[in-house]
UniProtKB/Swiss-Prot annotation:
One of its GO terms (cellular component) is bacterial nucleoid. Keywords: Cell cycle, Cell division, Coiled coil, Cytoplasm, DNA-binding. One of its GO terms (molecular function) is transcription cis-regulatory region binding. The keyword DNA-binding applies. This is Nucleoid occlusion factor SlmA. It comes from Vibrio cholerae serotype O1 (strain ATCC 39315 / El Tor Inaba N16961). Gene3D superfamilies: Tetracycline Repressor, domain 2 (1.10.357.10). Residues 31-50 bind DNA.
Amino acid sequence: MAGNKKINRREEILQALAEMLESNEGASRITTAKLAKQVGVSEAALYRHFPSKARMFEGLIEFIEESLMSRINRIFDEEKDTLNRIRLVMQLLLAFAERNPGLTRILSGHALMFENERLRDRINQLFERIETSLRQILRERKLREGKSFPVDENILAAQLLGQVEGSLNRFVRSDFKYLPTANFDEYWALLSAQIK
């Protein structure tokens, strides 16, 4: 029973941190004192569940990474058409950001500006994994469909991910007014016409 309470408290702390990142407080540095107040516990209680604030952010980053990479792997398993795979991965990233504005502050790096450099490195590694997945999709086109792209797959993967990152940054910069998935079908029609 005590184990469940500890797990629930850890989840409660992470949920509160994500909510604070989504609110106006997320636009500035979040302190453990503010977080403890939000959760309704002492700062010491926070540290019974997490050894540092960096570990709290790592908990959210792990959730982001697991959520995105497991779904990207599912797209690999279920979809075989290259352009559909790319579209689905891009939609996944944009929809995840839209549903989780607080976590998008982490993905954009905004919430990590004054935090441990290790956290920014973790986000960079996540984006590198996503870019590698996009590159793999692009390279498999030649094997699956006997076609290649008009530009190098490395450049194309970087461009696709850059488009997503730009949408995420715009979402954060606008205080979540410009939804990342807005007009995606029109945007995709323009993008896919260029890469066919």
